[in-house]
């Protein structure tokens, strides 16, 4: 929040856009300046809203976005701490005020349990054939299944739904997104195959659950 003013006299106003642009540049540069180059961190904005008239300096600005990472401790937590610090210091420097409207605790990354992943691969190669199994690149989208893996061992897999002839396979959150529903058959088969292998596995799964209360973990879900 800044101070309203006329475009002819910016010196008599306090434009929150000035504060925001500095903050945005700092957040964008945080990855290269402060995070291990072997750690992944992305930052993007989904919206910035401020003002309605070309000749009126607004008094408010709101913005929202996400930061994605594969290590909460090495990338996620440092980014959140820097965001809060930079927001406080920049608003003080520019004579503005700021309030965080919504920022839940960071969601954990999905890490498949090694034993479960090996068990699932063996089962799927046997039931579906090794030619149908791929190792995809790490995925940057947030996934609430990460919370389940904090309490129980498990594995997350993806089912192919692309079909160019049917026009299926566009990116998520786009108007063109659609799935080839025949892929759901293989997803069901994968789940059954893994469940049977897990239940018939004679080797105990070594796992230490996160001691954080379930109610607290649930608050991380965006």
Model-based region annotation:
Residues 19, 29-30, 81-85, 129-131, ...:
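His/Asp/Glu-rich mid-to-C-terminal helical/loop segments that flank catalytic regions of hydrolases
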Residues 1-112, 139-140:
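Midchain, well-structured core segments that form catalytic/ion-binding scaffolds
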Residues 56, 135-139, 203-205:
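Acidic, glycine-enriched loop/beta-strand segments at the rims
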Residues 69, 82, 88-95, 119-124, ...:
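Domain-wide signal for the mature, well-folded portions of proteins, strongly enriched
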Residues 25-32, 107-161:
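Active-site-adjacent substrate-binding region
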Residues 16-19, 23, 116, 144, ...:
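Catalytic-loop motifs flanking and including active-site residues across diverse enzymes
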Residues 56-60, 152, 172:
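Short, solvent-exposed loop/turn segments at the edges of secondary structure
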Residues 46, 101, 158-160, 178:
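Residues in well-ordered beta-strands of folded domains
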């Amino acid at each position: 929040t800044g101070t309203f003013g006329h475009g002819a006299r910016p010196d008599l106003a306090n434009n929150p856009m000035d504060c925001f642009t500095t903050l945005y540049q700092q957040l964008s540069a945080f990855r290269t300046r402060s995070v291990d180059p072997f750690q992944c961190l992305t930052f993007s904005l989904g919206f910035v809203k401020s003002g309605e008239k070309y000749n009126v300096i607004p008094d408010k600005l709101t913005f929202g976005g996400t930061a994605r990472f594969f290590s909460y401790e090495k990338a996620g937590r440092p980014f959140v701490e820097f965001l809060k610090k930079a927001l406080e210091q920049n608003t003080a420097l520019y004579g503005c005020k700021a309030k965080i409207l919504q920022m839940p605790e960071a969601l954990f990354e999905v890490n498949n349990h090694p034993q479960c992943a090996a068990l699932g691969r063996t089962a799927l190669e046997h039931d579906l054939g090794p030619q149908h199994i791929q190792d995809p690149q790490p995925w940057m989208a947030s996934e609430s299944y990460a919370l389940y893996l904090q309490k129980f061992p498990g594995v997350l897999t993806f089912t192919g739904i692309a079909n160019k002839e049917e026009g299926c396979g566009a990116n998520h959150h786009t108007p063109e997104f659609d799935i080839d529903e025949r892929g759901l058959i293989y997803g069901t088969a994968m789940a059954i195959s893994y469940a049977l292998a897990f239940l018939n596995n004679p080797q105990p799964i070594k796992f230490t659950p996160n001691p954080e209360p379930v109610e607290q973990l649930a608050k991380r879900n965006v």
